[in-house]
């Protein structure tokens, strides 16, 4: 994936000429605001129609006089900018290196309702860390697979973070039944990485390690991942303790109770080790965040950026603008004000 960022900048080849601009406030003050100067100057004026004999008040005369000469001052200032040699620089930053393709496999079985992380259940805390994880990997395509008794692709690999987060928020425990088919979830993730052309392809599994309804053996998963050169990183969430369980179903029904599991991460360890990934055992907030951060470091791609700069001189445009301003000045001074220079 190539990202293109364009930046436009206005630069000057001879910037010292810009110091001439400081004299214009002095000229304007001397001609129009200094006592007994421009504010008191009399000049002939005539109006069209039946108003030729109408005598305007001094302040209206002075206002029209200043308004007319403002075009002359603007024209002169634009000429100074033209002398300074203005140019537009278009800087293009092209990311040549492609991002990684990552599929997150998320357990949404009932045991993920165990409350042990900052008063949140395992699923809600996992969602929170996933959001932080994807926000740090701007150039990566990231997908999401959820599994329980069944498994399903929730988000195809994409760079659309808003869409990803929306679908992530819409996941509920037991959406896919009461069970834990880890092998099926990983197999679906692998099928979506099969035709990926990314330099790095990996899967991140977040589960409490309880597998009780799987139709796909771990050896099948390992062989498929090895054949596709996909690394599988596993984050085992849990321990062999009793936890309170709190979660809400999509229907709005709320479950609350206790849960004791037999935590056995051996399957996760074997899958990760044989596919070139790593296994992380998580039992508190700190270790959970460390696992995500460590994965980000190991699967980080070195970014190659090409910078192309295109300069275009625009002094001619400034001269045209100055000419137009002078033309307006002469129209006002010669036709509307009937001033004789």
Swiss-Prot record:
Its main location: membrane. It is a multi-pass membrane protein. The chain crosses the membrane at residues 8-28, 63-83, 171-191, 317-337. InterPro entries: UPF0353/GerABKA_families, vWA_BatA_type, VWF_A, vWFA_dom_sf. Keywords: Cell membrane, Membrane, Transmembrane, Transmembrane helix. It is found in: Cell membrane. One of its GO terms (cellular component) is plasma membrane. This is Uncharacterized protein BB_0173.
């Amino acid at each position: 994936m190539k990202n293109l960022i364009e930046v436009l900048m206005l630069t000057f080849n001879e910037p010292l000429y810009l110091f001439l601009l400081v004299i214009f406030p002095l000229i304007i003050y001397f001609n129009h605001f200094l006592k007994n100067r421009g504010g008191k100057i009399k000049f002939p004026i005539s109006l069209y129609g039946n108003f030729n004999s109408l005598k305007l008040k001094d302040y209206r005369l002075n206002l029209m006089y200043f308004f007319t000469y403002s075009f002359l001052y603007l024209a002169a200032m634009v000429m100074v900018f033209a002398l300074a040699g203005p140019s537009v620089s278009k800087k293009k930053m092209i990311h040549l290196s492609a991002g990684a393709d990552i599929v997150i496999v998320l357990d949404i079985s009932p045991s993920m309702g165990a409350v042990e992380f900052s008063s949140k259940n395992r699923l809600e805390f996992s969602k929170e860390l996933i959001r932080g994880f994807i926000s740090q990997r701007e150039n990566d395509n990231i997908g999401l697979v959820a599994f329980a008794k069944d498994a399903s692709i929730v988000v195809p690999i994409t760079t659309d973070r808003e869409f990803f987060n929306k679908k992530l928020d819409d996941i509920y425990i037991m959406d896919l039944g009461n069970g834990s088919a880890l092998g099926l979830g990983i197999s679906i993730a692998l099928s979506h990485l099969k035709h990926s052309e990314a330099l790095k392809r990996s899967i991140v599994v977040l589960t409490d390690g309880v597998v009780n309804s799987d139709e796909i053996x771990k050896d099948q998963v390992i062989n498929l991942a090895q054949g596709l050169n996909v690394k599988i990183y596993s984050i085992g969430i849990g321990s062999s303790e009793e936890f309170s369980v709190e979660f809400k179903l999509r229907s709005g029904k709320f479950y609350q109770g206790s849960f004791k599991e037999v935590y056995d991460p051996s399957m996760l360890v074997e899958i990760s080790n044989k596919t070139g990934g790593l296994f992380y055992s998580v039992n508190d907030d700190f270790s959970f965040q460390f696992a995500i951060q460590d994965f980000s470091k190991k699967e980080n791609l070195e970014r190659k950026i090409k910078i192309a700069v295109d300069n275009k001189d625009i002094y001619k445009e400034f001269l045209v603008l100055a000419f137009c301003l002078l033309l307006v000045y002469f129209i006002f001074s010669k036709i509307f004000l009937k001033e004789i220079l």
